[in-house]
Amino acid sequence: MKKLLSMFLVLAMLVTICSDNIYIANAATNKKKVICIDAGHQTKANLEKEPIGPGAKTTKFKVTGGTSGLWTKQTEYALALKVAKKLQKILKKRGYKVIMCRTKNDVNISNSERAAIANKAKADAFIRIHANGAASKAVNGAMTICQTKKNPFNSDIYSNSKLLSEKVLDGVVDKSGCKKLYVWETDTMSGINWSKVPVTIVEMGYMTNEKEDRALNTASYQKKMAEGMADGIDEYFKELKK
């Protein structure tokens, strides 16, 4: 009887140890990726200047108010936040941890400060949501933006930022059906230059184009944009695993 009891206790200990190991393994496997979302602009522009990157002599406005729809009169900052909140909800459902740079329009957060939020969170991806404008009302389509491979501030994350930009652009185009433009590589964007984590700016469309302005003013199209971004983020991480 004592022998059977001893065997039972040993078996129970083994089950407990194995269960703990399984739990630890699953926890490691399911470790959440961190996505930082920046809804571009804000209600009131801050026209004070800040360096465009760490140690830079060149400066830009801390943050502008953005553009607005020629037909709908919807502001870019309001549109960006609507899509950002939709993206937040979708990403959380997909198991991501989401950090929001802002959750309301009446804030005062510079572009370098927004990048600092992503850096502090050690985000796996930094998604900056914007909309475009042009002198010609005929111009339309979505594009993404990242730094160049010779960026003086963060060239070490160029490859990942470019890949992120490509995948997010593909996702947005596939989901919304909008015209695909390109990934614009530039070192003039403060919010990109200050970032220490893979980053992209998503220009969802032109608010100076009637068709896109009206589409971007609908909840259904905004949701498509958010879903497309989420799909692109998924594909980005899949590609990194290859």
Label for each model-derived stretch:
Residues 1-242:
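Catalytic-site microenvironment of enzymes
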